[in-house]
Amino acid sequence: MLKKLALSTLVLTSALFASNEVNVYSHRHYDTDKQLFKMFEEKTGIKVNVVKAKASALIKRIESEGKKSPADVLITVDAAGLYAAKSKDLLQSINSNYLTTNISENLRDKDNQWFALTKRSRVVVHKIGSDVQNQLKTYEDLADPKFKGQIMVRSSNNEYNQSLLAAVIAHHGEEYALTWAKGVVANMAKEPKGNDRYQVKAVANGIGSIAIANTYYIGKMVDNKDKSQRDAVSKMKILFPKFENGGTHINVSGAGVAKYSPNKENAIKFIEFLASKDAQKLFAVGNYEYPVLKGVESSKLVSSWGEFKDDTISINTLGENNKAAVKIFDKAGWK
Ligand code: FE
């Protein structure tokens, strides 16, 4: 009831003060965002209203709200979420010179229905001095029986894993992807549970030797109030695997404008702001993500992890192969 009330208030407010706010449906769950939204509010006087939930729930909500949806901007933490929103005809093309000039083609939808705001890489994290660094070079290696009982990775309902498997499909086809997923399952140290940081902590504490995690979580563990996270990550090192015929797996967090956005101008301003130099710097320094704007550097900590070459497949493929990836995870018994 309360939820319903809040929503109708939102609709009403957006109708009355159309030019003074932007309604953001966001799957991002990082503190930096609060700071960014505040910066935008101070700069433009446009109030940012945020609804936070998983992309799948936000997409369902926009669908059921239909033409009356108050959503202006959809932000996801994964390319497949944006792809799904576009496929369901929930987004619209964004007419912005700034965005098309500054965000490279591989990091946006071909009809400009969404733009990446940050890049993140899904990598291997191992103990400093561990033999893993000599034994593992590629994502394909993760399925090698020599790593039996060594891998800590979260569950298959997580979009970061789904996109990684989507990339495996893009490189090798579905048949190989199933063999690969079965191989990784056979190599798991434990049944999947917890988030990316949980996997890193487990390996730091001697459970398995390979944790699979997104890069920025390592930064967030270093820069953490919780001593147990700092202690765990101080023992660890990042290894950037690559695909046999490609580079290191890249995913994006990005934004699109909702099809029935009541504050379209504000929505575009908001996304342009998130792609501006100041905002990109904060994504880099505050959340340890890779900026998408040319000329903005990664944080010192992130740079210290080393360089890698982005995978060669198109980011859109992650969305195209998502359904197949989910099915394959199921068949492989990846919990
Ligand atoms: Fe995340």
What residue spans do the PLM features occupy?
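A structural signal for short loop-to-beta-strand junctions that line the ligand-binding cleft
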Residues: S69-L74, Q92-V124, E140, Q150-V153
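Short beta-strand->loop
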Residues: Y25-R28, Q92-T100, K110, Q113-F115, H126-I128, E140, K148-H172, K227-H249, ...
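Periplasmic-binding protein-like
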Residues: G149-S156, F273-E297
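An extracytoplasmic/periplasmic, membrane-proximal ligand-sensing/linker region
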Residues: A177, Y288-K335
